[in-house]
């Protein structure tokens, strides 16, 4: 795959006055995850996923209903301060406003994940995506920040650390709610219970800062192509410019408009496995805008490190509902997803659904 510097540089997309052919998507079969009958238009219907107040006494039921219906929901009164959300959005804007040459100094390596670059799913699509991003998956981001902000890196590293700490607590809280809606608890997940008792982390988090520049022909471009997240769940903060869309068979593409202080939660592949298929991992994408750029910050809460085997929760299986998926480690699943992309779930499936 050519390096970022050899192609139209993603760091300069916002300055282009015409849409390059390599970034021009067709209006039909725009991505491989859509059924042919549904892949005829980029238009989204006027509907949206529910906004759930986490202080509501019925929060577990509400989250469960939304998760089963949409594989996604929005949350308010989640405990994350507006200042922290503003700080990480400002950090992202400062980073993406830098000259392209400067950003490329913090580019991710060929074998690494952390750093600046195009979406990880790019190799699976013929056309390029109208976006740039910065991934924080380990402590190497501190070196990148030192390169980008020689005098202010300590301040920006502090923002990231606070965001990770707060999102980790929120993700754990949401996990309890979603499990509760299925009638199970973390104690019913043997490996998760052991990790909690030992003081270890149930999941590993990463952050993806995304920037979708203004686009001369947004109706023919794609900011981020349709996909599911590999995670247990993903928590997304989006700036005040819309672009996120989720897909549901009964509804088609549905735009998730941003609202102040509201976060979006997407169910990922790992939770779909844990739930034995009862809760879907949501297919989603990002569209772009002709007049306004968009920033989003995704907290990707994945599986645990090491050789922990992840499989459907035993209480959710039985003679009438056999396990749909074989056990797998987080690392192994990521490798399969990297190789076969949207066919990863099929690759670990052991039986067909009974209905």
From Swiss-Prot:
Span of domain Fe2OG dioxygenase: 203-303
Tissue expression: Expressed in siliques and in seeds, specifically at the rim of the embryo and the outer integument. Also expressed in flowers. Not detected in roots, stems and leaves.
Cofactor section: L-ascorbate; Fe cation
GO biological-process terms attached to the record: gibberellin biosynthetic process
Catalyzed reaction equations: gibberellin A20 + 2-oxoglutarate + O2 = gibberellin A1 + succinate + CO2
Cited SUPFAM superfamilies: Clavaminate synthase-like
Role: Converts the inactive gibberellin (GA) precursors GA9 and GA20 in the bioactives gibberellins GA4 and GA1. Involved in the production of bioactive GA for reproductive development.
Protein name in UniProt: Gibberellin 3-beta-dioxygenase 4
Gene that this sequence comes from: GA3OX4
